[in-house]
């Protein structure tokens, strides 16, 4: 018996087993995709378990209930008022990404390749106009050590505005050639669409977040015990719920014959295009979150009596647009991400009278969702090391300052302020953020 137990422990601690355990998310995702392929009626929208409610509402609500339990109310409200970060993410999510994808689709359309379906290109444009995803970017931002409070606020704001912005962008991109054939029925179902989106965002994001905040403030000891229990036993509720959300999306897509309605060449094209465009958008989001020229234009804080009034006002307005690393990670996850939970509703509502093309329209969105989660999961470890590197550097600088009794006051202030402070208060360190 002892020999068998030691053998099991040896196998469990083997390097191959450790690697498989580290990739548990993708292994579970692959299993769920296979189940969705052969039993799509189980978790699809309108299926056996009514996935649009049990998963579309229940799983997303649990994620934000968890977020509400672990976030301080004062910090949450401060992040809600961070208009600079919200403006940056909204411009990236709606305007920049959709315009770039539209340009690529025009180029592909001009190539006139018969293997690339015309309605798949419309699906790409629709995917690019969707708001940021509801669940995955919150989970990835939290795991990477980014500003999850800002991410939660952005999910609420972005999806609320997406109900109005997405249909308007679709009309703008499809009201003339070369994509006039894909223009949805103008005005049909838009009012109902707004109602559904408001209901879903309210019930799955706002209400559980509010309930979590109430529980946290009324029962702080019980909340701390619950969160400590999850942390002690490595229970990752957010990741489990995200797997179920993707399971429901794939079930809906397979049930509507989304992957069999287009050619294999088109599917391969979408896989590589989605991967490349997501990585490109992540890099673009980094450039928007930490533009190098701001440090060149504003190398130091305004000096009383020496700096001009123009420099002082310009510094206060533009310098906070160079975000901290925590906020930058949130921007890099929220900017390129596109929601499938609300995206399916946005697409089906606009193309309700074109059911024969609905499967083709959903293919780019479903594939983009799984690829963005896989790629973002890879970025988590990179971003975490990026933050930890500065945390270690700040710690070494602080210890050196304590040993030296005659330390420059300016240096002490810069260390005390810290890189990791959010830009919400607009108290920007004198030293340049790393």
UniProtKB/Swiss-Prot annotation:
Compartments, record wording: Cell membrane; Bud neck
Induction: Expression is positively regulated by calcium/calcineurin signaling through the sole CDRE element (5'-TTAGCCTC-3') in its promoter.
Extracellular side, ranges: 37-50, 109-118, 171-199, 256-264, 349-362
UniProt family annotation: Belongs to the bile acid:sodium symporter (BASS) (TC 2.A.28) family.
Keyword terms, alphabetized: Calcium, Calcium transport, Cell membrane, Ion transport, Membrane, Phosphoprotein, Transmembrane, Transmembrane helix, Transport
Any single Gene Ontology cellular-component annotation: cell periphery
A GO molecular-function annotation: monocarboxylic acid transmembrane transporter activity
Chief site of localization: membrane
Example GO BP: calcium ion transport
Protein's organism: Saccharomyces cerevisiae (strain ATCC 204508 / S288c)
Name this polypeptide is given: Solute carrier RCH1
Record function comment: Solute carrier protein that negatively regulates the cytosolic calcium homeostasis in response to high levels of extracellular calcium.
Membrane-protein topology: Multi-pass membrane protein
Membrane spanning stretches: 16-36, 51-71, 88-108, 119-139, 150-170, 200-220, 235-255, 265-285, 328-348, 363-383
Cytoplasmic-facing ranges: 1-15, 72-87, 140-149, 221-234, 286-327, 384-434
